[in-house]
């Protein structure tokens, strides 16, 4: 597991492109037959990819977290963006097709991931945050979620937001997680942009062609920076940073947040004339 530390806005004001990428970008989220995770000290979120091929995979971080088992003091969100697979939670095995999600509560002792076909492996994107209470495990299908339709074709930001781990769907301590799909012809996400001082966030971009790129905007609104990102790459967004992007084509991304509350609308909008 890779560890990333926290920064203030002043810390990054003179960072080079290489330094920004090293601190905030995760270049390889899904590694075949591996659990590939990042631990950020921003609200102590863990995120990354689990890509089982010929063997089942389990997240084991006892030593790294100082616990007896991974979810002893944590909750977990899972969304499959690959081929059909399975998730086994404390002995109960369930199928997970593409776009299926799962909320797994605190004190769940074992979570095992597997694929139906090694040639078309499942790609489980996971996010985990510290938890103080045990809430029920819930399987989440995208078909059961009424999307928020927002943006316009005229402003190139027409998109559907599917809220998986959200009070309307399931209970959680502090983790929120969802899936945003941009319509063909749209390229902007989260613009006009915002920050949320009370929560950090992480994105993973995907459903992109090989030559499609995302210009992910970050940093203090008065001193913005950007990262050029490719398919299935992730980025950390501290609470003080904007997090927006524009692609050379449409794309999808999974967002995950944790922090002081689970109020999705708790955000501080940034007027366009304040961006620099």
Swiss-Prot record:
<comment type="similarity">
    <text>Belongs to the KduI family.</text>
</comment>
<dbReference type="InterPro" id="IPR021120">
    <property type="entry name" value="KduI/IolB_isomerase"/>
</dbReference>
<dbReference type="GO" id="GO:0019698">
    <property type="term" value="P:D-galacturonate catabolic process"/>
</dbReference>
<dbReference type="InterPro" id="IPR027449">
    <property type="entry name" value="KduI_N"/>
</dbReference>
<feature type="binding site">
    <location>
        <position position="194"/>
    </location>
    <ligand>
        <name>Zn(2+)</name>
    </ligand>
</feature>
<comment type="function">
    <text>Catalyzes the isomerization of 5-dehydro-4-deoxy-D-glucuronate to 3-deoxy-D-glycero-2,5-hexodiulosonate.</text>
</comment>
<keyword id="KW-0479">Metal-binding</keyword>
<dbReference type="InterPro" id="IPR014710">
    <property type="entry name" value="RmlC-like_jellyroll"/>
</dbReference>
<feature type="binding site">
    <location>
        <position position="196"/>
    </location>
    <ligand>
        <name>Zn(2+)</name>
    </ligand>
</feature>
<dbReference type="InterPro" id="IPR011051">
    <property type="entry name" value="RmlC_Cupin_sf"/>
</dbReference>
<feature type="binding site">
    <location>
        <position position="201"/>
    </location>
    <ligand>
        <name>Zn(2+)</name>
    </ligand>
</feature>
<dbReference type="GO" id="GO:0045490">
    <property type="term" value="P:pectin catabolic process"/>
</dbReference>
<dbReference type="InterPro" id="IPR007045">
    <property type="entry name" value="KduI"/>
</dbReference>
<comment type="pathway">
    <text>Glycan metabolism; pectin degradation; 2-dehydro-3-deoxy-D-gluconate from pectin: step 4/5.</text>
</comment>
<dbReference type="GO" id="GO:0042840">
    <property type="term" value="P:D-glucuronate catabolic process"/>
</dbReference>
<protein>
    <recommendedName>
        <fullName>4-deoxy-L-threo-5-hexosulose-uronate ketol-isomerase 2</fullName>
        <ecNumber>5.3.1.17</ecNumber>
    </recommendedName>
</protein>
<dbReference type="GO" id="GO:0008270">
    <property type="term" value="F:zinc ion binding"/>
</dbReference>
<keyword id="KW-0862">Zinc</keyword>
<dbReference type="GO" id="GO:0008697">
    <property type="term" value="F:4-deoxy-L-threo-5-hexosulose-uronate ketol-isomerase activity"/>
</dbReference>
<feature type="binding site">
    <location>
        <position position="243"/>
    </location>
    <ligand>
        <name>Zn(2+)</name>
    </ligand>
</feature>
<dbReference type="Pfam" id="PF04962">
    <property type="entry name" value="KduI"/>
</dbReference>
<keyword id="KW-0413">Isomerase</keyword>
